[in-house]
Amino acid sequence: MLNWLKKLGVAGYASILGAVFSLVAMIIYIVNSTTGYLAGSSVNALPIIFAILAILLFVLKVALPEKLQNHWLDSFILLAAVVLLSVSICVFVDARTDVAGNQWFIPGMATDAQGACLSVAIAGVVFYVLAVVAAIVAGFCGTKKKA
């Protein structure tokens, strides 16, 4: 059953990690945007949509290693995943700048709820960055082990 997993190269494992990190980051973004300090605010759907698209691109890279090997689409898939995840990071950070400003630079405005919100947001951004790093690593390695 897991023979396909044994045949994966470094890029295959990095792509799986990238998909998992993207999923975790997306879940953190949704939780951070809908609970706690930001419970009543509107949620920007771009990071959610872009994370789902990046996950689908990672799955495509792992599912079709023979067809994408030495093809320009292989590089394009990873480039698109990096761009989508980078835009997600930018939107995520942009939506949390007021919380970070209140917490770090205006001592009278800092609250425990904002501190918790900011801590969770930082964890989400870290997972997005880890997904980007996984995509970059996958770009420099082979998806399938050489026979």
Name each model-derived stretch.
Residues 8-13, 29-56, 74, 121-122:
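Transmembrane alpha-helix entry/boundary detector in multi-pass membrane proteins
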Residues 33-45, 88-123:
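Interfacial non-cytosolic loop connecting adjacent transmembrane helices
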Residues 1-21, 137-147:
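Cytosolic juxtamembrane helix and N-cap/initiation of the first transmembrane helix
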Residues 20-31:
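Alpha-helical transmembrane segments of multi-pass membrane proteins
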Residues 61-95:
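Loop-to-transmembrane helix junctions at the membrane interface
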Residues 69, 97-99, 130, 134-147:
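Cytosolic juxtamembrane helix at the C-terminal end of the final transmembrane segment
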Residues 50-58, 119-138:
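Hydrophobic cores of alpha-helical transmembrane segments in multi-pass inner/ER membrane proteins
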